[in-house]
Amino acid sequence: MDLQAQLEELKTKTQEALKQLNGDHSKELQELRVAVLGKRGTLTELLKGLKDLSNDLRPVVGKQVNELRDFLTQAFEEQAKVVEAAKIQAKLDSESIDVTLPGRQMKQGYRHVLTQISEEIEDIFLGMGFQIVDGFEVEKDYYNFERMNLPKDHPARDMQDTFYITEDILLRTHTSPVQARTLDQHDFSKGPLKMISPGRVFRRDTDDATHSHQFHQIEGLVVGKSISMGDLKGTLEMIIKKMFGKERKIRLRPSYFPFTEPSVEVDVSCFKCGGKGCNVCKKTGWIEILGAGMVHPSVLEMSGVNAQEYSGFAFGLGQERIAMLRYGINDIRGFYQGDSRFSKQFK
């Protein structure tokens, strides 16, 4: 059989072999390609016969060989696409999903109880015309202490153990620095300042059932003309009644805070026994809930506010304490352990 006839026969047999590889036969297709077009394949062996042809016939047959190589290369590429499509379809068929089956319910997350308490308190104050102001958790000693009427040699600094980063930079021990910064910027020609500053604060406490090295506070500040202790009492009564019920009463006890004068501790009538005395209120009928007072004139003066013309009141309450009292939680550490079973109770 001459070389041209062998080339034609190779073309015919290869086409027939390719037609048999319609399914997932990628391995067989590769083996056939190597057998026909590889370095030791049939076409390569036939090329060796060109040297035995006459000078007139060699170019003609050489062209035929090149055309056959191109034809077979394209045929293998097209068949490879067919085989790959068959492979994908077979995988889809084996991994088919019955869309009529019921889905698996995702586990539901829960808003943290402290988030709920914070948002509830913020909504109350927004309804009373207060603005919410955020501030820095890493604060300057100047704003955290000195602007709160606590100079470096003030003995009251011993009341708070502090996380210092440098000599003058610390983790804030209260959100009062936000009030000082806001007081600096407020334009009293546009009206009084009414604000709250919620956020995390940090103290060097040993963690136990009632203490934590970090906790949350919401501090409030109102400064304007003719602000009195009566305004403070009325504001606190409204907050307490909205938080703990309309039947709740408050009482003010004299206390001491460096940044307010006079200062008071605020108690709420026990919401468990109604003031009769129980284990929650320690048989007193009252529960300590927050601290407050009239803004110290020195604090106003340090912000450039004329203390003869303006006065104000400030207060601070802790979200953890409110949550513990409201829900009977006896260990503050439960707020920070990330246990969904704990959060689920307050959904």
Swiss-Prot record:
<dbReference type="GO" id="GO:0006432">
    <property type="term" value="P:phenylalanyl-tRNA aminoacylation"/>
</dbReference>
<keyword id="KW-0067">ATP-binding</keyword>
<dbReference type="GO" id="GO:0140096">
    <property type="term" value="F:catalytic activity, acting on a protein"/>
</dbReference>
<keyword id="KW-0436">Ligase</keyword>
<keyword id="KW-0460">Magnesium</keyword>
<keyword id="KW-0547">Nucleotide-binding</keyword>
<dbReference type="GO" id="GO:0005524">
    <property type="term" value="F:ATP binding"/>
</dbReference>
<dbReference type="Pfam" id="PF01409">
    <property type="entry name" value="tRNA-synt_2d"/>
</dbReference>
<dbReference type="GO" id="GO:0000287">
    <property type="term" value="F:magnesium ion binding"/>
</dbReference>
<keyword id="KW-0648">Protein biosynthesis</keyword>
<dbReference type="InterPro" id="IPR022911">
    <property type="entry name" value="Phe_tRNA_ligase_alpha1_bac"/>
</dbReference>
<dbReference type="InterPro" id="IPR004529">
    <property type="entry name" value="Phe-tRNA-synth_IIc_asu"/>
</dbReference>
<comment type="subunit">
    <text>Tetramer of two alpha and two beta subunits.</text>
</comment>
<dbReference type="Pfam" id="PF02912">
    <property type="entry name" value="Phe_tRNA-synt_N"/>
</dbReference>
<dbReference type="GO" id="GO:0016740">
    <property type="term" value="F:transferase activity"/>
</dbReference>
<keyword id="KW-0963">Cytoplasm</keyword>
<dbReference type="InterPro" id="IPR006195">
    <property type="entry name" value="aa-tRNA-synth_II"/>
</dbReference>
<dbReference type="GO" id="GO:0000049">
    <property type="term" value="F:tRNA binding"/>
</dbReference>
<keyword id="KW-0479">Metal-binding</keyword>
<dbReference type="GO" id="GO:0004826">
    <property type="term" value="F:phenylalanine-tRNA ligase activity"/>
</dbReference>
<dbReference type="InterPro" id="IPR002319">
    <property type="entry name" value="Phenylalanyl-tRNA_Synthase"/>
</dbReference>
<dbReference type="InterPro" id="IPR004188">
    <property type="entry name" value="Phe-tRNA_ligase_II_N"/>
</dbReference>
<feature type="binding site">
    <location>
        <position position="261"/>
    </location>
    <ligand>
        <name>Mg(2+)</name>
    </ligand>
</feature>
<dbReference type="GO" id="GO:0005737">
    <property type="term" value="C:cytoplasm"/>
</dbReference>
<dbReference type="InterPro" id="IPR045864">
    <property type="entry name" value="aa-tRNA-synth_II/BPL/LPL"/>
</dbReference>
<comment type="similarity">
    <text>Belongs to the class-II aminoacyl-tRNA synthetase family. Phe-tRNA synthetase alpha subunit type 1 subfamily.</text>
</comment>
<protein>
    <recommendedName>
        <fullName>Phenylalanine--tRNA ligase alpha subunit</fullName>
        <ecNumber>6.1.1.20</ecNumber>
    </recommendedName>
</protein>
<dbReference type="InterPro" id="IPR010978">
    <property type="entry name" value="tRNA-bd_arm"/>
</dbReference>
<keyword id="KW-0030">Aminoacyl-tRNA synthetase</keyword>
